[in-house]
């Protein structure tokens, strides 16, 4: 991701026709983040979700393992006056945060990329307070077979072309399909959250299930 950080947002705008910003704004809206709360935008990338949450008034930390991505986020936050956001480089599998310390965790397009999704979810659960909210935005697997086939073809052939044209790096986007095939997606992620004793897990399908949002409340 470091090699494509400078043009990461451009490629996302092109490949989704700008819709990724709409989906992230929906995450921000669903998060119900408010003044007096403490939140974490995990795998924050260039800061889209963090910027949106910062406007809600709570104290927010944006964490990512990739320094070039954090540098892009810092530049964007500086332009937008994101005083309520503190950025930190950290591993999602070993969060430098105390137990039960957060009201909210969001993770956009990051869970699928963790070295161990199960360990990542356990860490998120550890730092969330009882009653805390977890929102996950990521690629999904459409239930409709025809749509899924067309979607996979797009990810296999079209998306890497955008990556090559905009960043000179097709491989950074070609991996998405491979990672998605291994990702449990909508029902699989919900099942893992159920095992971690979240009392409420909602799945919101977007664009026929090509994307999805999970909203979970910790017991």
Feature-to-residue mapping (PLM):
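Class I SAM-dependent methyltransferase SAM/SAH-binding core
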Residues: 38-94
């Amino acid at each position: 991701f470091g090699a494509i950080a400078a043009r990461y947002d451009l490629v996302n705008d092109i490949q989704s026709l700008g819709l990724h910003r709409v989906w992230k704004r929906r995450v921000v809206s669903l998060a119900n983040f408010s003044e007096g709360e403490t939140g974490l935008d995990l795998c924050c990338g260039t800061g889209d979700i963090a910027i949106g949450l910062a406007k809600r008034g709570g104290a927010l930390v944006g964490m990512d393992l990739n320094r070039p991505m954090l540098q892009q986020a810092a530049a964007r936050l500086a332009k937008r006056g994101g005083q309520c956001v503190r950025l930190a480089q950290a591993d999602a599998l070993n969060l430098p945060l105390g137990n039960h310390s957060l009201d909210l965790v969001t993770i956009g397009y990051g869970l699928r990329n963790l070295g161990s999704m199960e360990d990542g979810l356990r860490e998120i659960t550890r730092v969330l307070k009882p009653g805390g909210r977890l929102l996950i935005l990521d690629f999904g697997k459409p239930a409709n077979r025809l749509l899924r086939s067309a979607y996979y073809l797009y990810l296999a052939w079209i998306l890497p072309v955008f990556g090559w044209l905009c960043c000179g790096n097709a491989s950074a986007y070609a991996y998405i399909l491979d990672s998605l095939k291994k990702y449990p997606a909508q029902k699989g992620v919900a099942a893992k959250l159920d095992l971690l004793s979240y009392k409420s897990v909602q799945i919101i399908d977007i664009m026929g299930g090509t994307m999805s949002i999970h909203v979970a409340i910790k017991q």
